[in-house]
Each structure stands twice: as structure tokens, then as C-alpha cells.
A protein has these predicted regions:
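Short alpha-helical transmembrane segments in multi-pass integral membrane proteins
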Residues: 37-104, 151-173
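Single conserved hydrophobic/aromatic residue that forms the stacking wall/gate
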Residues: 1-7, 11
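Hydrophobic alpha-helical interface/terminus motif in multipass membrane transporters
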Residues: 5, 37, 78-79, 118, ...
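Small-residue-rich hydrophobic transmembrane alpha-helices
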Residues: 12-69, 108-127
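Transmembrane alpha-helical segments of multi-pass small-molecule transport proteins
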Residues: 100, 104-109, 131-139
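Hydrophobic/small/kink-forming positions within alpha-helical transmembrane segments
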Residues: 28, 135-136, 170
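Hydrophobic/aromatic residues in alpha-helical transmembrane segments
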Residues: 33, 74-75, 114, 141-142
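Alpha-helical transmembrane segments of multi-pass membrane transporters/permeases
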Residues: 47, 117-144, 159-166
Length: 173
């Protein structure tokens, strides 16, 4: 049982690493948008960028959805590239976790973009509070969904960790 749990954690960590790399790589739009919003906010010329924020949100949503869908569809190829030859049950844990987390890719990118807009408007408090709320929800749901809760919620293991993260992201959005 301990070995199985360690394998699940290893796969979760590797899959999380790939998802995090994609999110932070693609979230550089946030940095650009933050700088542009900040410059125009400081010079009181927000009218010049009123269409930029919705356009960036739409582009992020489309790009994140396409990449998320491709990752779900081509998971087997990505997994073999990243993990090499792995045991079937370990592969299945990774697949379950990764596919759920890939659904959240566009959500993660939108959250990062919102944080960039907040920073551009010199309002870092909102991003901090939203992050704290998301983190607390994720931790709470991790415990419940991974280990279960009485007879009402059965333990979900690594899949529960993925659902906890996705749920926290939805609340943050």
C-alpha cells in the first residue's frame, strides 16, 4: 500500500511539473498585459486599451483550450516522452491525473492573466486573497478527496488530488 501511494505521488509530481511549466510559460502574456495596463493606468489613458484586456482573455482561453485538448488527446505520446517505459498501473495513475489537470489549463492561464490585470491596476491585494482562498480550498479538498471522508466520500487517490486542484481553480476564477 505504501509503495502504491509513493508511485501515485511520484506521477502526480511529474505531471504537476509539466502542467506548471506550461502554465508559467504561457502565462507570460500576463506580464506583458500587466506592463501595458500599468503604463496606461499611470498616465490615465485606459481608453486606449479598453479592448486589449478582453482580447487577451479570449486569446488566452482559446490557446489554453487548444493546448489542453491536445495534451489530453496526445497524453500517451507525452507520457512516453516524459516518463519513458513505466508500469501500466503507474501509467494509468498519471493518465487520470494529467487529463483532469489538463482540463484546468485554460483556467490556470486565465487566473494568471487576471492577476496581471490586478497588478497593472496596482491592486495586488486581490490576487493575494484569491490565491490564499484557492490554496486553502485545494488543501482542504486534497485531504477529503485523496483519503476519503467516512462512508460518504470514497478515497480517490491521485485522481482526487487532480479534482481538488481543478475545483480550487474554478473557485479562484
Amino acid at each position: 500500500k505504501t509503495v502504491r501511494r509513493q508511485r501515485q505521488m511520484c506521477i502526480r509530481d511529474r505531471s504537476s511539473g509539466l502542467i506548471a511549466t506550461l502554465i508559467w510559460g504561457l502565462a507570460q502574456m500576463r506580464t506583458s498585459l500587466s506592463a501595458i495596463v500599468s503604463r496606461h493606468f499611470g498616465s490615465d489613458h485606459l481608453d486606449k486599451i479598453k479592448s486589449l484586456i478582453p482580447q487577451t482573455f479570449l486569446m488566452t482561453l482559446i490557446l489554453g483550450s487548444i493546448i489542453g485538448a491536445l495534451l489530453i488527446f496526445y497524453f500517451d505520446v507525452v507520457a512516453i516522452f516524459l516518463f519513458g517505459d513505466i508500469e501500466e498501473h503507474t501509467f494509468n495513475y498519471a493518465k487520470d491525473y494529467f487529463k483532469i489537470r489538463a482540463i484546468g489549463l485554460p483556467i490556470s492561464l486565465l487566473i494568471a492573466l487576471f492577476f496581471g490585470v490586478f497588478r497593472g491596476f496596482q491592486n495586488t491585494s486581490w490576487a493575494m486573497y484569491i490565491s490564499l482562498i484557492g490554496g486553502v480550498i485545494n488543501i482542504f479538498l486534497d485531504v477529503i478527496l485523496i483519503h476519503g471522508f467516512g462512508d460518504s466520500i470514497k478515497p480517490m487517490g491521485v485522481e482526487g488530488a487532480a479534482w481538488a486542484s481543478l475545483t480550487a481553480q474554478l473557485v479562484m476564477l
